[in-house]
A protein has these predicted regions:
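Conserved helix-turn-beta segment immediately C-terminal to the redox Cys motif
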Residues: 677, 695-715, 793
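Conserved redox-active cysteine motifs that mediate thiol-disulfide chemistry
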Residues: 675, 683-700, 717-719
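Short, solvent-exposed, Trp/other aromatic-anchored flexible loops in extracytoplasmic proteins
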Residues: 83-124, 131-132
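Oxidative protein folding and maturation machinery
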Residues: 336-673
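Tryptophan-anchored aromatic micro-motifs
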Residues: 26-32, 146-161, 251
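A non-transmembrane, solvent-exposed segment enriched in polar/low-complexity residues
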Residues: 142-148, 178-405
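Non-catalytic, surface beta->alpha helical segment in thiol-disulfide oxidoreductase systems
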Residues: 759-762, 768-794
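Short, internal strand/loop/helix patches
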Residues: 568, 728-768
Length: 794
């Protein structure tokens, strides 16, 4: 009896100790998808563990916790969610898998989530919402009694991130250190050459006194996804200087797993280039076994830089849109678990402010799939205008709420959102049947599109796309463009200039051609499928065949050809320059447009500037921009230097299929020499940006597939011979297993119809027996799945 009583007493004591175990305000790490969650308490009970959560929902968002949610301890064991019943006053009942809306009046609420009981000796655990790869979570939830329960510490006077004390390494002074010693009160860091001694004092008013190599400073731990707001104002302005230089970005990637390594984990950088237009530059570097990396980033001034911690072909674990300056040195932390990214250094304030998520609630204005009438375009454009006004109001409210936020942060966001709205509105021109915006929008665009002389020209990437769209829009409206396309208004414009005389019969034919164009436009707006569009379009062409013959006869007249070549010369890019001279004559816009015209010509054609375009160089008044364009021209002048023999060895003559007209017969003849091998068919064009981007990166794919006996068959669509050879040489597509053809248009079209292409690039696999297999153009980005497809081929 005494033994039973003793056991009962011990059990009661154990239950009592459970009931008293509560973590108040435990430390934890937020990941990218949980920045609005805060753990106020953790209750440990013998039959359950309870998480008490405060939820903030910016812009009236909702929250959902999956019924698959669980707690996870360091040994890998999981403890499932069992309910969401309120246990305290002020909490709301919650049912897992349902949507939880916070109060409309204060945008926050409180709930309690119950889980299977954690072990009594638990010191740290994770809360993970489901098993999806990007499920949100609260990680490293740690007993607050542990002094170093949060690894990240900031200087309370300056707001800067000073120290990261992680399990395996430390981050201090923009470097990664190993531990020579680590206790709750003393840490010694070493890099093998230098030691840093850190002593940690007692907590007082949320701070601890750290002594780092004899220097004392008050630090406070933080666990938010981004740094807390800075305590002092910063009125520094951006430098507007245009200059070339490299920013050096070093960093540390935490919580890398073997799976990440196997999936080609890397750092990828994208930077806009205002000289080259809407073409982002890309730079990549590897991450070493400790998680460290360094990359040099060429810049043209203070500008936006997009940083991605990527794996596989296109997946990314963390990302940051930041601003860097030539010759600047920066350090960034990327965490694979929490998705956190933070900057450390003497001049990292702007970079950390830009990582805040609170300002990112930008409403989407909408897009139009396919062609639309002007009324529909205006409706979407007005939504973008309304949303821009909302954006400005949000920024004003944000500035009032956070008076210490830096001037550069606000200046950038105002500028970026302005050009973001302009770019998205201008992009709606692609939904118009004549590729131009309704005139009703020109006033708003003109009013809001001025270049701010107090901001760096190269700062925002949206300015690159906006300028290109604006130039294209003006070009499409130009009579020169209509002349270039031999449209009715082009003939009438030549007549108005006294350069062409038209007969009554020719005027009648031009009037009929205008009616034909109206019918075509109405057909495009009808939303018919591709087959029906072709059928009806052919009927319209038959209906107006007689007037088309008259117009064709005009184009064969010598007076027309003389006027045409005088006004249009080298085609689209020459016409663009004429339009820029009349529509955008003021600096610096004129120089930017001229730079982009020449750069885009070379990128599109993959060849140096023609004689008709070289004089445009003198119109570029910004010396650095002109120098960059000239370097690009020299690159294409010398692109085949030393490569002619290799290129000629892999290009094949179209005479191989001479006389064949059937698409299947032509393709069978092309692949006949490679029976018994897998053929990877790539249908591309020198004019196709996505095609060239994939070709540029194709060597990585080929390296991954080196164990397969693959022949890479490249068929170029509508590609000038010089451009075609230049692309082959530029991207070194000259391996022995590469085969290149530039077939006559009819034969190329026959193959494309046979393989049923829907766009460019198009990829197909031809198995060892000659069977044709369809591929989506992104299928090769999932390598394990793609290799499985190859393994299953006969």
């Amino acid at each position: 009896m005494k033994k039973v009583a003793t056991s009962l007493l011990l059990m009661l004591i154990a239950i009592g100790s459970w009931a008293q175990k509560v973590w108040n305000n435990p430390s934890f790490e937020q990941n990218l998808y949980s920045s609005n969650l805060n753990i106020t308490d953790v209750e440990f009970k013998p039959n359950e563990t309870i998480l008490h959560l405060n939820i903030k929902a910016y812009h009236k968002n909702w929250q959902r916790f999956a019924s698959a949610s669980f707690l996870k301890t360091p040994d890998g064991k999981t403890y499932a969610i069992t309910g969401g019943k309120a246990t305290r006053e002020g909490e709301d009942d919650y049912t897992p898998d349902s949507l939880y809306y916070t109060s409309a009046t204060n945008d926050e609420g409180n709930i309690a989530l119950q889980f299977e009981p954690l072990p009594a000796k638990t010191k740290t655990f994770d809360f993970i919402e489901g098993y999806e790869e990007r499920a949100f979570g609260l990680l490293d939830i740690t007993d607050p009694a542990i002094i170093l329960s949060s690894p990240n510490w900031r200087n309370t006077a300056t707001g800067d991130w000073i120290l990261g004390l992680y399990n395996d390494v430390a981050v201090y002074d923009s470097k990664v250190w190993k531990y020579a010693q680590k206790t709750d009160k003393k840490v010694v860091l070493t890099d093998g050459k230098e030691n840093i001694t850190i002593t940690i004092g007692k907590e007082k008013n949320g701070e601890r006194e750290f002594t780092i190599n004899g220097k004392k400073q008050a630090l406070a731990m933080f666990r938010s996804q981004t740094l807390p707001y800075y305590p002092t104002p910063d009125t520094t302005s951006f430098s507007t200087e245009i200059k070339e230089g490299e920013a050096i970005l070093t960093g540390y990637v935490r919580n890398i797993t073997p799976q990440h390594i196997n999936r080609n984990l890397r750092i990828e950088i994208r930077t806009p280039n205002v000289v080259k237009g809407d073409m982002a530059e890309e730079f990549t570097t590897t991450i070493d076994s400790l998680g460290k990396f360094e990359i040099k980033i060429p810049l043209l001034g203070t500008q936006v830089v997009h940083v991605f911690c990527k794996y596989d072909q296109s997946s990314y674990a963390a990302s940051a849109n930041t601003i860097l300056t030539p010759n600047g040195k920066y350090f960034i932390l990327a965490d694979m678990n929490t998705k956190r990214m933070m900057f450390m250094g003497d001049d990292a304030r702007l970079q950390n402010e830009l990582l805040t998520r609170e300002t990112l609630g930008v409403p989407y204005g909408g897009w139009i799939d396919g062609y639309a009438c002007n009324d529909s375009i205006l409706k979407i454009a007005n939504m973008w205008i309304s949303n821009y006004d909302i954006n400005v109001k949000q920024l004003n409210e944000y500035a009032a709420k956070h008076p210490n936020v830096s001037k550069r942060f606000l200046d950038f966001h105002y500028e970026n959102r302005r050009f973001g709205a302009l770019s998205n509105i201008m992009m709606l021109k692609y939904s118009s049947v004549d590729r131009t915006l309704p005139e009703e929008l020109s006033g708003w665009i003109e009013k809001n599109s001025a270049i701010n002389p107090n901001m760096p020209l190269v700062l925002c990437d949206y300015i690159c796309s906006f300028l290109r769209y604006a130039r294209e829009n003006a070009t499409e409206k130009s009579p020169l463009m209509k002349l270039s396309r031999r449209q009715p208004d082009g003939f009438l414009w030549l007549e108005s200039k006294g350069l062409l005389k038209l007969t009554d019969k020719e005027h009648a034919a031009i009037d009929q051609a205008k009616e034909a164009q109206k019918e075509i436009n109405n057909l495009l707006l009808s939303k018919k499928d591709r087959k029906e569009l072709n059928e009806v379009g052919n009927k319209i062409n038959e209906k107006y065949a007689a007037c088309n013959e008259v117009i064709d006869s005009i184009t064969r007249r010598q007076d027309f050809m003389n006027a045409y070549h005088d006004k249009v010369k080298n085609g689209y890019f020459y016409v663009q320059h004429q339009v820029v001279n009349s529509e955008f004559p003021d600096e610096p816009l004129h120089s930017i447009h001229c730079s982009q015209i020449l750069s885009e010509f070379m990128d599109h054609e993959r060849m140096p500037l023609t004689d008709n375009l070289i004089p445009i160089l003198d119109d570029i008044k910004i010396p650095l921009f002109k120098e960059i364009v000239m370097r690009q021209n020299d690159h294409y002048k010398n692109i085949l230097k030393g490569k002619e023999e290799a290129v000629n060895a892999v290009i094949h003559p179209s005479s191989d299929v001479e006389g064949l007209t059937d698409g299947k017969a032509i393709l069978d003849k092309l692949v006949e020499p490679y029976k018994g091998k897998i053929v990877y068919l790539d249908i591309w064009g020198t004019w196709c940006g996505p095609c060239k981007n994939k070709l540029k990166k194709s060597h990585k794919l080929k390296a991954e597939l080196k164990d397969y006996d693959i022949v890479y068959l490249y068929l170029a669509n509508r590609s000038p011979e010089e451009s075609w050879k230049n692309v082959i040489g530029e991207y070194n597509l000259t391996e022995p297993n590469c085969v290149h053809y530039n077939l006559p248009p009819k034969q190329q079209r026959a193959i494309e119809q046979y393989v049923k292409i829907t766009g460019y690039p198009t990829y197909r696999l031809i198995d060892r027996k000659g069977g044709l297999h369809h591929l989506k153009w992104t299928d090769d980005e999932d390598l394990p799945k793609f290799k499985k497809t190859l393994d299953e081929l006969p």
